[in-house]
């Protein structure tokens, strides 16, 4: 046995071949710059420098919204996983299984209930990583359950939309979720509760033809692609060249389809302010804000919300007149 050949060299070779994690670096789609993944994650998945908004998973989105990154997961109704026994190149059941393994989620929509600057809210998040955030039976039931819970809790409902549209593998059962979710939104509206929609990149297809465009307030993240059909399909249909930036959040804001385009770092305080205005809830005391936010945000929140009232100076005594 050659000790140098069989013991030392393989160990050295293993050190040199040590694998690098696949997600160690992220390439900015806008500038092509390579950015350390942890830096992007800590920056709410916004690329430092270019401010490009990457897609956010459902869990990361909920953590960014609720106080102390704490919320209650809402139990969602069970539905038939593959009602049509659909198969194209692969079985639909296998696609669902792979998506669940990849994301750790049961389906494309996750619903949570918690506090937003002390105010109870229900939030539903579509995860684009789960089969393109497509709307199927499970996603429709999740959104409807979230809206029902908002009525039960008498709380605002915030919808973070990100989808390629209806899930084709479920056929008409998927399309049926469009009117069902629309009716549920109307139920929330009749209860006098706010429905706020945040359009993220991308929000397209049947989702924009239903609940995603029904908000009392329509917000969008910078650069988000929002529309029904794709730009290429529209150009081929109308035989005209579309304007630059067509279907982007800023274009829709400038043309009245979106109320505000909000940077992700400003989204949480903006949502809290809108919820308080729409529910006519007074601002919390400085002490309540400090209790609900983490230590890093306490000083900023107190400085931003504290109002110092200076009493008027007492008038100087007037000398008696002769």
From Swiss-Prot:
GO terms for cellular component: acetate CoA-transferase complex. It holds the Pfam family Carboxyl_trans. One of its GO terms (molecular function) is ATP binding. Pathway: Lipid metabolism; malonyl-CoA biosynthesis; malonyl-CoA from acetyl-CoA: step 1/1. Keywords: ATP-binding, Cytoplasm, Fatty acid biosynthesis, Fatty acid metabolism, Lipid biosynthesis, Lipid metabolism, Nucleotide-binding, Transferase. Signal peptide: none annotated. InterPro entries: AcCoA_carboxyl_beta (IPR034733), Acetyl_CoA_COase_Trfase_b_su (IPR000438), ClpP/crotonase-like_dom_sf (IPR029045), COA_CT_N (IPR011762). It comes from the Bacteria. GO terms for biological process: fatty acid biosynthetic process; malonyl-CoA biosynthetic process. It catalyses: N(6)-carboxybiotinyl-L-lysyl-[protein] + acetyl-CoA = N(6)-biotinyl-L-lysyl-[protein] + malonyl-CoA. Its main location: cytoplasm. The keyword DNA-binding does not apply. Residues 24-293 form the CoA carboxyltransferase N-terminal domain. It is found in: Cytoplasm. Its EC number is 2.1.3.15. Component of the acetyl coenzyme A carboxylase (ACC) complex. Biotin carboxylase (BC) catalyzes the carboxylation of biotin on its carrier protein (BCCP) and then the CO(2) group is transferred by the transcarboxylase to acetyl-CoA to form malonyl-CoA. PANTHER family: ACETYL-COENZYME A CARBOXYLASE CARBOXYL TRANSFERASE SUBUNIT BETA, CHLOROPLASTIC. NCBIfam families: accD. Belongs to the AccD/PCCB family. Acetyl-CoA carboxylase is a heterohexamer composed of biotin carboxyl carrier protein (AccB), biotin carboxylase (AccC) and two subunits each of ACCase subunit alpha (AccA) and ACCase subunit beta (AccD). This is Acetyl-coenzyme A carboxylase carboxyl transferase subunit beta. It comes from Rhodopseudomonas palustris (strain BisB5). The lineage of its organism: Bacteria, Pseudomonadati, Pseudomonadota, Alphaproteobacteria, Hyphomicrobiales. The gene is accD.
